[in-house]
């Protein structure tokens, strides 16, 4: 081969090499782009899952466990003392919410934003449409000291019930389980 032919051949190979290198660089860039998209999709998926979990927690559709208190209320057997009413339970729930309770249940009926607590008669109270009987066991997850203080302070709901003659016990715990709401959540007035 002559020198001119060698130079031409070398130039052809150099051109082919540069073209192959260019394609390689483009493919590397695409691979990197796909990796970033995959990571972004994973991050998006994780974010969506976290939001779904938080929404389910707020809707009461998941069990919640953490520090908190368990209150047991046994009504007095004396006929001279007024029975425990739905209003008493509502006052306890409201006091717990004000003290920062993150989840509350009464006799394992999860308290939601649309929970109804109503008197049926002197023996029965309905929570979420379910009839509950005494003793009433109220569980609340949150700062256990704050929750207890909200109930036992002077003029607190538990303090008032004790003064009336009802038996009220409050136990602080590092492990309180508030079970999920098993019913269907339906809205009457919200449009889809």
Predicted regions mapped to residue ranges:
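Core subunits and conserved enzymes of cellular information-processing
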Residues: 1-192
